[in-house]
Amino acid sequence: VVIIVIAVIAMYNSLVQARIKVDNAWSQIDVQLQRRFDLIPNFVETVKGYMTHESETFEKIAELRTSWANTESVAEKASLDNELSNALKTIMAVSEGYPDLKANQNFSELSEELRNTENKISFSRQFYNDTVTMYNTKLEVFPSNIIAGIFNFKSRDLFEAESADALSLIHI
């Protein structure tokens, strides 16, 4: 009986530790995504003067920033991240036609910061998905699946991103 109690406690603690790792990995993504959202207003202001025909894209970015602040779930944040990446791709593609903009030092610095942030997001997303996969596996394998069911541990969603990141076009 004592051995069974010790085994249950050990499995429970293992599941709690795995859940904490998932939460930590998510907060790392959240920090990087927030950093990107913080960079975007300066970036938009820099390009606005050059790109007068992209007002819809700028409005979309503003809407996404507002939605981001009110979103909690991983799936919703992943969807917003994909939309933002697409908007950034549009801006970066259009910027190719503006040599004066590309020569602007502020634009170059912000593009570099965005590229670095995109790299960090990519690495954080990979780490999060690896951590979630390990956690979800623990929830499925015997005998920890019994403990997970008793103590109501829930599986977590992966952070699904589109195949091409905004990073692919941020190469000024």
Where are these regions (language model features)?
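A helix-centric hydrophobic-segment signal that preferentially recognizes long
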Residues: 1-170
